[in-house]
Amino acid sequence: GIDKGDYAVFKGIPYAKSPTGDLRFRPPQETEAWEGVRKAQEFSPKCTQRAKSSSFYEKEFYSEPQYQVPMSEDCLYLNIWTPAPSSIAPPLYPVAVWIHGGAFSSGYSSAISFDGEAYCKRGVLLVTINYRLGMWGFLTLPELAEENGDGTCGNVGLLDQIAAIRWVRENIAAFGGDPENITVFGQSAGSMSISV
């Protein structure tokens, strides 16, 4: 991660296996532990989407060059902003998980508008997540339903969100977060996801 003094940022942490090859259009699979130290200093690629967001989103959320990232199908990563430990801090910080908007077809977790510094200053740990978008996250085909065995397919973008929240619950204590005090919130498609 990156030590910012009052807080630390851990970028590009995988919460599921890469959804490529045989895992494309499939529910997210639990990631395997990695060997050694993961630096977690660079944002991951954003999930594959249209090359340019709508002018509103481009202007409001994704205009800062240092927060722009390449696209890739290998995109199931999250970012964590955590307050620095202090003698007056609670044993574990409350956790806020942010789900970005973008009409389920655009957006990403590392946009400047979703930076967690302000949350850390208030004693809240922030997590932002990527999830599959457009046809990569919501394609429904009879062939895919047949392969699943239960007759269902599609909505893997929503399953990605569930997998990310599950990862947070299982691992956030290692970053100073309270797994029993998690609030999920979002904007546009992100807030709609929470109500499903």
Spans of features found by a protein language model:
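Non-catalytic accessory segments of hydrolases
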Residues: 1-158, 179
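Generic structural signal for well-ordered alpha-helical scaffold segments
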Residues: 79-82, 169, 173
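Acidic/histidine-rich, metal-coordinating catalytic segments
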Residues: 99-101, 184-190
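Active-site-proximal structural scaffolding
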Residues: 112, 161, 187-190
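Alpha/beta-hydrolase fold nucleophile elbow
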Residues: 156, 168, 175-187
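Short, well-ordered amphipathic alpha-helical segments that serve as non-catalytic structural scaffolds
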Residues: 161-169
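Short glycine-enriched nucleophile-adjacent loop
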Residues: 191-196
